């Protein structure tokens, strides 16, 4: 089993998941320009799943080229609402608009992970969760946004599923770690067998 991995992300949520699962790691952010990569892939009309996979691989490979002997973990999550990707909000006004678009609808949250060594992918995994948002009033949506911090708002794709965000949904199907952006059970399985 690998003693330590490199997390190619500065995501506080992903760091927390790894810590809670006793996975030894250090952080080397990839600083990939996700928006331009997404924009380019959307022009090619690829699916949200492919976008998530490609971004996770790009992040892992970029850092893996720098630290060739080490195991590097890249991850990415994408929200697919009716075939359209929902990006993280830049401010509370955008967050409210996103929540209004999701209101009463089901969306898919796609989380991909990639493990690379020597600049190339050696393993990847993608998982999906399906979340159905309650029909909520404008006031309820505004009140929800008032309850969460700016940090949580931007880090969790508008909703913090392990906190206040759970109250937004009438139905949640899928693994909570996937919804939080890191399907850690599969990562742990793979790390047990890798040399």
Curated annotation (Swiss-Prot):
Record-stated family: Belongs to the Maf family.
Cell location: Cytoplasm
Enzyme nomenclature, EC number: 3.6.1.9
GO MF entry, a single one: nucleoside triphosphate diphosphatase activity
Main localization (coarse): cytoplasm
Natural source organism: Pelagibacter ubique (strain HTCC1062)
Function: Nucleoside triphosphate pyrophosphatase. May have a dual role in cell division arrest and in preventing the incorporation of modified nucleotides into cellular nucleic acids.
Protein known as: Nucleoside triphosphate pyrophosphatase
């Amino acid at each position: 089993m690998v003693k330590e991995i490199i997390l190619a992300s500065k995501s506080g949520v992903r760091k927390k998941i790894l810590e809670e699962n006793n996975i030894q790691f250090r952080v080397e952010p990839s600083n990939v320009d996700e928006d331009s990569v997404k924009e380019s892939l959307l022009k090619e009309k690829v699916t949200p799943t492919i976008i998530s996979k490609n971004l996770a691989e790009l992040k892992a490979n970029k850092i893996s080229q720098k630290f060739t002997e080490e195991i590097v973990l890249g991850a990415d999550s994408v929200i697919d609402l009716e075939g359209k990707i929902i990006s993280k909000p830049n401010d509370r006004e955008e967050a409210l608009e996103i929540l209004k678009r999701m209101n009463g609808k089901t969306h898919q949250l796609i989380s991909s992970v990639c493990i690379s060594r020597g600049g190339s992918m050696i393993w990847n995994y993608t998982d999906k969760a399906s979340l159905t948002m309650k029909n909520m009033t404008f006031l309820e949506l505004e009140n929800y946004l008032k309850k969460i911090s700016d940090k949580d708002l931007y880090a969790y794709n508008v909703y913090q599923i392990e906190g206040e965000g759970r109250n937004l949904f009438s139905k949640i199907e899928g693994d909570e770690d996937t919804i939080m952006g890191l399907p850690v059970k599969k990562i742990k399985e793979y790390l047990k067998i890798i040399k």
